[in-house]
Structure formats: C-alpha cells, structure tokens
Amino acid sequence: MKMSPRAKQYSFELSDDEIDLMVGVPPKRITWDGADARIRAGLLENGLRSVVLPDAQMRDLLRELAGMVQAHALSRMDSDASYIEGLYSKKPWGLARSPAICFTGLQGVGKSQLLQSLAHLLRARGEQMSVRGHAGIDLIPMWLITLAKGDGLNQLLREHVDPAWQDAEDQIAQKNTSAPKSWSVPKILEIAERVSWRHATCLAAIDEFQWITASSSANARAATVLLKIHGIGPLLLYCANFSLVHKLKGRPPEDRDRLLSSPIIMRPFGPQCPDLTAYLKALVAVAPDVFVFEPAKDQESIFLFTFGIRRKIVDLLVAAYKITCRGGGHGKVGVPQMRDAYQSELYAMHRDDVEVLFRQHVSGRVEKEDLWCPFGSTTQVKSNVTEATAIIEAFEKRVEDDFLRESLTPTERQALDALQPQTSREAKPGKVLRFRKGKATKEDLLAGADLLDKLC
C-alpha cells in the first residue's frame, strides 16, 4: 500500500537491534579517580540512572504507539487533496476526535523514557514534503509536551506553534526583554490546530503529568487541560500515574470515553524475566568493582526487594553502596548488602511501596490507589495466588532468618550450622487446613474448636 509522506513518517520498520542502537544508552564504567565515599555514591547513582536498555516490552510499545498514530494519519490526511483542503479550512481536523491514549504504569517503570525514545525515533528523520502549491513543508511527527514549566495552555503549546516564543524565553533568561504576551485560549487552540495540520503532526504526547496532581482540584484541572489539547486534532497520548487515573474515573461518562477508553499500561519486570537479567547485567557493568552479585542467580531476590521497578532497583543499589561504605566499609554490594539496604531508612519509602504491592497482588484488594492499576494487573508475576504467596513467604522467612542469625553469638551460630542440615531432613511438611466459605454456624465453631484442641 502506497502511503503519503504524512503517514509514512510513522512507519516503524526498524529491527530490534536498530531500535536498541538508536534509543539505548549503554552502561559506562565509572572512573573513581580517588573520590571519597560521598562523591562515589553520587557518581554511582548518576551512572546507573543514565543506563537505557530497551527491552521486549519497550520495543512492543514503541511499535504499537507508532502504529496507532499512523492509523490516525491515514484516516485524516492520507490523500494530497484532503491535506490541501485542510490547509484552507478553519477546522482542518474536522469535528470527530479519536479517544486519547492513557499511558499509565507504576512510578519508576520507565514511562517517561519510553516517550522520549518515541520522540527520538520519530524526529530523527527530519523529512520534508511538497504538495501542489506548497513546497518544502517540514514534517513534525510529534509534540512532546511537558508540564514541568506549568499547566497553562500557553506554557504547554506556545513553543510548538510559535517559533518566536522560544526565542523570547531565551532573551528573558538573558534579561534582555520582558515576557511575551500570552495568547487567549481560543486563539492558541485555533493556531495549534492549523499548525499541527500544516506540519502533519499527528501525535501530541504529554509527559510529567503528575505535576498537575499536586492541587486539591487536580481532577477538574487535569480533565480540562487534557480535553482542550485533545480537541486540537492530533492523537493525544498522555502519561499519568495511577492516582490521577482513579480521579479521572470519577468524571462524567463523556469525559471518561474521551480520556480513559484507550489505556496502555507499562509493567515492571517479572521475577524470572530475561529482560530483568539483562538490565541487571547492564547496571553491574557501570561499577563491576562494586557489584558482586550474579544477575541471573540473584534476580529473584532483587525482585523481592523492588517489585521489578527500575527506579527502585537503582535506589536499592545506591542505598546498599552507601550503607556498606559507612565506617570505612569495603564498598562491595551483594544480596546481603541489598537486604540490609531494604531494611534501612534510606529505602524506607520504597520498602513500604513494595510491601503494599505484594499484599495487593495476593489479596486482590486496594490499599493505596497510587499503587493500584485502575485497568487491571500491572505485574508480570503469574496471577496464581499460590505462587505469589510463596514468593512473599519465602522473602519474609529469609529476612526473619537473617535477623535471628545476626543476633546469635559465634558459638551459637556454629551450633546452628551443625544442626541445620539435620533439622531440614527431619522437618515435616506443613499441613494446610482449608475452611469452607460462607457464614459460620454454631456447629462449625464447635467443630473448629475441637480440631484446634486436637492439634494442640
């Protein structure tokens, strides 16, 4: 099928290796140069955070998003005639709007990085097109909008539709001029619609949307901003955390249809995911003289400390390094040091989140809305409750055993080591008692009491 350049700019014919080469940031080994422990910890954190390793999920999402945008372009401006007609129309995109894409996931799984990667892939071509009467039109496949500077429409859109705006901001930074006058909302929306059509910009992606959730009126404000940008014409892709999506679910049905009917969820690593192994290997390569764990062997333990979330993995490793350097320590990080970091004050916030995530996964009940996916499960852990429970119980038992072991004297520890194999061989398997669901009767309670007496 022959496509116009407006739709072809979203063709995604790259192999996995080509995607990795274009958007990946390989690990760079740190050179310490005699820095003290505090500086080393900062260098380590920066080095770990800079690693971008595309995985199977990331590549699939990039291809899926590009395909959705290409379909949008094909349905709106594939023929030159329809495109030229739109150039002279006040409403080039028409009145119908496709549902926005709600891109969500746990904080720290890599959503912002994926949007930046998508922007890099689409903008790398730098193509132009020509149609009858119009030559050398720049194709701008995507607007990447951020709320870091504010949530006003001038702050969000002006730099994309008014080239003079960025020049004015640069001059303000140099104290050479005053701030340019803001456009009215109708004016900026009208210009945004026409500029996006002219440059065949079929995707408007909003990142850093968590900035808008700080106010008490976040629900109404977020919906208003999203609906205004959604009404421009390009396909809207907005990155939102779970808490905001829960708030948007309370909006009227027409708002939910526009903003929540097309969700895409980015999930954390699973406990035995090969991509987690590859990611851990990349992190080890940043400081192989520091990290002494084996990624393939120890990744399940690391999953138990982090729930497979990239940001938490990095923060755990940095916290473990800081702790092991205290008092002139050796600065080596293995699983025991990560376990110490997990229990420390440096990782307390993450530890609370991880424990809530595991409990929610097993119980199926909401404890914290900002950690509960509004659209379904977020994990790559199998949904089998027995397996998930076993993972959590193994983790809790391991932590308890370590605490008990640390409290023993050297003599007691040697005695425990001598008894441990024999104890393991003689241990009897636990007995699981299954209780019938339903309302308990007096007879049930009496029977249960008799059973407990026999067991005791």
Predicted features and spans:
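Walker A/P-loop-proximal flanking segment of P-loop NTPase domains
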Residues: M1-P99
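Post-Walker A helix-loop "phosphate-sensing" segment adjacent to the P-loop in P-loop NTPases
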Residues: L121-G133, D167
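A short hydrophobic beta-strand->loop->alpha-helix junction that borders the nucleotide-binding pocket
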Residues: T104, M142-D151
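Walker A/P-loop nucleotide-binding motif
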Residues: W93-Q116
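C-terminal alpha-helical "lid" subdomain
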Residues: K2-D33, R198, G270-T277, K281-C456
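Mid-core helix/loop region of P-loop NTP-binding domains shared across ATPases and GTPases
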Residues: D78, P92-A96, G152-A218, K228-G231, ...
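The catalytic "switch" region of P-loop NTPases
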Residues: E193-C202, W211-S215, N219-K297
